[in-house]
């Protein structure tokens, strides 16, 4: 989860002031809960408790400061992310207090450095990897922009991971085994990457005996 406009308050203001919410209609937790519930979003309480309400499938908004966040649906710590990017939000100040907000930001800095920045590097790495593999620019934009978003997750399914989402680095890893060109709907063998195969297969006839056991353990496939 990250802000739609990539800005960050560099300090926490010590001035005491009253903040009028930008979206008064979502000031109550019930109103924010309802914004998620009517769109059949599950486990939405952590977002509404963080002062956020549903805007679109790719965007949520803080009712108080008005900051918008993208790629939010699998975020585990929305309160921390909200406080990290919007340090002078009236809701965050009222919820945690200035001292509590400072402590939370300090603890979140490690997560942001080790997780978020690494994912950004993986994104850049994946673009270069896909380019080297001969994929078109339109396909690379498709992967990088929509890898986490439904309905595009159906293209890469049955992925066994500890988390519910996969990183961009894993996309590159998967595609290095199974070369798929969405532009002309051609699928290649997961092992040799040379022989063309049917859409419902994973290996060419020559590679099937060598990879059947490995495929059963890894348990992923690509569906077009």
From Swiss-Prot:
Alphabetized, the UniProt keywords read: Activation of host NF-kappa-B by virus, Host cytoplasm, Host-virus interaction, Inhibition of host caspases by virus, Late protein, Metal-binding, Modulation of host cell apoptosis by virus, Virion, Zinc, Zinc-finger
What upregulates it?
Expressed in the late phase of the viral replicative cycle.
Query: Mind telling me which GO cellular component terms the entry cites?
Result: host cell cytoplasm; virion component
Top-rank taxon, per record: Viruses
> Where in or outside the cell?
Host cytoplasm; Virion
Q: Which GO terms describe its molecular function?
A: zinc ion binding
Q: Zn fingers (C4-type): where?
A: 189-207
GO biological process: one example: symbiont-mediated suppression of host apoptosis
Chain positions recorded as Zn(2+) binding sites: 62, 65, 82, 89
User: Whereabouts are the BIR repeats?
Assistant: 29-92
> Belongs to which family?
Belongs to the asfivirus IAP family.
Q: How does it assemble?
A: Interacts with subunit p17 of host CASP3.
Q: Give the protein's biological function.
A: Prevent apoptosis of host cell by inhibiting caspase-3/CASP3 activation to promote the viral replication. Also induces the activation of host NF-kappaB.
Instruction: Write the protein's name.
Output: Inhibitor of apoptosis protein
């Amino acid at each position: 989860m990250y802000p739609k406009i990539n800005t960050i308050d560099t300090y926490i203001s010590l001035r005491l002031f009253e903040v009028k919410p930008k979206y008064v209609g979502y000031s109550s937790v019930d109103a924010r809960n309802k914004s998620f519930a009517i769109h059949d979003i599950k486990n939405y309480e952590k977002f509404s408790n963080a002062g956020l309400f549903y805007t679109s499938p790719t965007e949520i908004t803080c009712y108080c400061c008005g900051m918008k966040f993208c790629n939010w649906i699998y975020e585990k710590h929305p309160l921390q992310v909200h406080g990290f990017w919007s340090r002078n939000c009236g809701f965050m100040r009222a919820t945690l207090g200035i001292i509590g907000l400072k402590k939370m930001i300090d603890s979140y800095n490690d997560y942001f450095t080790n997780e978020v920045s690494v994912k950004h590097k993986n994104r850049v790495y994946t673009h270069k990897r896909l380019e080297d593999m001969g994929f078109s620019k339109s396909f690379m934009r498709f992967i990088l922009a929509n890898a986490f978003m439904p309905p595009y997750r159906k293209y890469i399914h049955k992925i066994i991971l500890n988390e519910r989402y996969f990183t961009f680095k894993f996309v590159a890893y998967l595609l290095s085994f199974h070369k798929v060109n969405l532009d002309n709907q051609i699928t290649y063998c997961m092992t040799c990457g040379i022989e063309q195969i049917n859409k419902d297969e994973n290996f060419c006839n020559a590679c099937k005996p060598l990879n059947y056991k490995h495929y059963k353990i890894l348990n992923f496939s690509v569906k077009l």
